[in-house]
């Protein structure tokens, strides 16, 4: 059954993505074991929904048919893709069979190819994505592959997102040519743009968004939507705003219950950035990033004690074990 007749919005992919990432970042083995059957069930549900083109069928999306989403949309498939990757990492930590985890990894690889072949598209002159088969108008959710680390069409997608067709003073339009905006896609897009390495463009639009939302005439939080709900505040959007910094600028991706990858992106006009008192991976730690000539100096401190101190080239990824 589906909530209020909203049809299948891709909930299975949403839950698997969120629960797997949460369990990794939380760092609690017992909690991870408790969540595993839910994650496993949702992954199997999505697998059974795969079309002949290898993407996930769903007859709606999180906008619940306010805008067309076709029979299979980009959002659901990219969420399922990242869920498979996170589940393979999480399962290793809690004793799931290697065969099952290898299957998840193989399914993720196949899905990445299917996303490119089914959704990859020249749309309104941009080398980007169509949201569903038959879609020929730019949609804000073309940002989703960037958020999940798929950069095959990054440049064309970023150009499309910040073109006058989609970007307004209130962030991204849900669909080009309309007046409707939902902050969630703008917040995902800013995160994905910075994570993809387009730091200066991402920061420029992040500043514009922050001035408008956090310091403007409807403050102090990110909003849900307009015109629906008259820009009401919901907590989820504020959480997504924070993730622009943690996953975009600091490039943190959980890869275990005690470890993560980090690809810091220090904006040119900043000399340093610090993220202190991070409670994740069952630990308490700080991350300090500063510029040293052409390189970035990265230091991670756990309970005040330095555990990593190294210089890296911009755009490089380092692994941290707490």
Where are the regions that the model predicts?
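Active-site core of glycosidic bond-cleaving carbohydrate-active enzymes
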Residues: 1, 12, 33, 37-44, ...
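The substrate-binding groove and active-site-proximal loops of carbohydrate-active enzymes
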Residues: 2-6, 23-33, 66-71
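Alpha-helical transmembrane segments of multipass membrane proteins
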Residues: 21-22, 87
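HEAT/HEAT-like alpha-solenoid repeats
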Residues: 24, 44-47
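A short, charged helix-loop
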Residues: 60-65
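Beta-rich accessory regions
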Residues: 97, 103-106, 110, 118, ...
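Terminal, non-catalytic domain-edge segments
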Residues: 238-268, 276-277, 286, 319
């Amino acid at each position: 059954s589906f909530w209020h007749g909203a049809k299948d919005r891709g909930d299975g992919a949403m839950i698997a993505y969120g629960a797997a990432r949460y369990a990794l970042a939380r760092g609690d083995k017992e909690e991870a074991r408790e969540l595993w059957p839910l994650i496993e069930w949702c992954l199997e549900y999505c697998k059974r929904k795969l079309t002949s083109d290898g993407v996930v069928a769903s007859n709606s999306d999180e906008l619940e048919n306010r805008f067309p989403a076709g029979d299979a949309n980009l959002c659901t498939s990219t969420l399922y893709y990242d869920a498979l990757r996170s589940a393979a990492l999480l399962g290793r930590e809690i004793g799931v069979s290697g065969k099952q985890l290898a299957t998840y990894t193989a399914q993720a690889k196949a899905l990445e190819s299917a996303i490119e072949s089914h959704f990859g598209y020249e749309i309104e002159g941009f080398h980007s994505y169509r949201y569903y088969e038959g879609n020929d108008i730019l949609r804000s959710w073309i940002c989703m592959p960037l958020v999940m680390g798929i950069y095959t069409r990054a440049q064309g997608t970023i150009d499309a997102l910040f073109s006058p067709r989609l970007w307004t003073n209130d962030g991204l339009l849900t669909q080009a040519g309309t007046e409707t905006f939902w902050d969630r896609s703008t917040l995902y897009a800013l995160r994905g743009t910075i994570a993809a390495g387009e730091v200066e463009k991402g920061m420029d639009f992040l500043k514009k968004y922050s001035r408008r939302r956090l310091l403007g005439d409807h403050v102090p939080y990110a909003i849900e939507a307009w015109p629906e709900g008259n820009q009401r505040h919901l907590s989820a959007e504020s959480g997504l705003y924070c993730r622009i910094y943690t996953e975009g600028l600091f490039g943190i991706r959980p890869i275990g219950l005690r470890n993560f990858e980090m690809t810091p992106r220090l904006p040119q006009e900043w000399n340093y950035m610090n993220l202190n008192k991070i409670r994740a991976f069952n630990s308490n730690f700080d991350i300090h990033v500063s510029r040293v000539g052409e390189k970035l100096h990265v230091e991670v401190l756990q309970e005040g004690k330095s555990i990593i101190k190294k210089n890296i080239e911009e755009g490089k990824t380092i692994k941290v074990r707490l």
